[in-house]
Amino acid sequence: MSSFLVRPFCLRATTTTTTTTTTTALVQQQLRALTTTTALTYHQPRVPSSAIPIPNVSGRVPLPDSTPVPEDFKIEIPSYPYGPRRVYHQSNTGLYGSALIRFGNNVSKRNEIKTRRKWRPNVQQKRLWSKSLGVFVRTRVTTRVLRTIDKVGGLDEYLLGHKAARVKELGPWGWMLRWRIMQTPEIRERFAKEREALGLPPRREEDEEKSLEEQLREFQVAGIQFAEGKAPKTKGQLKEEADRLIKKSETEEFGLGQEEDLFMKEEPKPTKMA
């Protein structure tokens, strides 16, 4: 009869094995849940009353199937003038400014032994409010750039900075966000008021194909005249003035060497007072 009974030791061994297996499975599930790998980056919200969504970090502008758009509708983001960053590639997917990984040494005070170390930028993942888009934009941003955004008055003002240093700080991702907010009616109206203040005519559809160099040259001429207090001249007035100078140079003959002769001419001897 004793051969048919199960020993208590075997029962304890079986129970211990089951508990260990269950605990291991739970730990594996927790490790999978705590993984740092992100499947989707920057899931941006939809922009209200607009068919153009916020672009992805990869540079593509997704158009959902439910969005009614024409067949010939094509979105092309202008290429970033400074190209992708070759150092610290992570900065291509966020607003990092000019931040890089800094390398240095830890020096012992007792025996001056040096050990290599590095300082990484303080990168945060934030939801920044865009006034022109009317939504929160998800992006990685450093604390130094956050300070600059607060100083200039918001995300839109930071992205619309026109100086070369600001454009370099934006990086490829900031350049795409800059392009997106420039498509909003609020920013277009703002640019139209700036053109009117500079004395430039309102922008027409045929002016869309004008090269960037011509537009910058036109703004530069009007801006210099506006800074000097003169009345800014329109494009037609500048063209008429150029034609008039060309015709004048063809009809009149300029005397060469007259100024040099006057420069070398001796002054008459002063007369003595009686």
From Swiss-Prot:
Q: Does the keyword Ribosomal protein apply?
A: yes
Subcellular location per the Swiss-Prot or TrEMBL entry: Mitochondrion
Known function: Component of the mitochondrial ribosome (mitoribosome), a dedicated translation machinery responsible for the synthesis of mitochondrial genome-encoded proteins, including at least some of the essential transmembrane subunits of the mitochondrial respiratory chain. The mitoribosomes are attached to the mitochondrial inner membrane and translation products are cotranslationally integrated into the membrane.
Listed Basic and acidic residues bias regions: 262-274
The disulfides recorded in the entry are: none
| Coarse class of the protein's main subcellular location | mitochondrion
Family membership: Belongs to the bacterial ribosomal protein bL28 family.
Any GO CC annotation of this UniProt entry: mitochondrial large ribosomal subunit
**HAMAP family, alphabetized:** Ribosomal_bL28
| Signal sequence region | none
Tell me the domain of life. Answer: Eukaryota
**Subunit field text:** Component of the mitochondrial large ribosomal subunit (mt-LSU). Mature N.crassa 74S mitochondrial ribosomes consist of a small (37S) and a large (54S) subunit. The 37S small subunit contains a 16S ribosomal RNA (16S mt-rRNA) and 32 different proteins. The 54S large subunit contains a 23S rRNA (23S mt-rRNA) and 42 different proteins.
Enumerate the GO terms in the molecular function aspect.
structural constituent of ribosome
Q: Which UniProt keywords apply?
A: Mitochondrion, Ribonucleoprotein, Ribosomal protein
Q: Does the keyword Ribosomal protein apply?
A: yes
Region described as Disordered? 249-274
Q: What is the designated name of this protein? A: Large ribosomal subunit protein bL28m
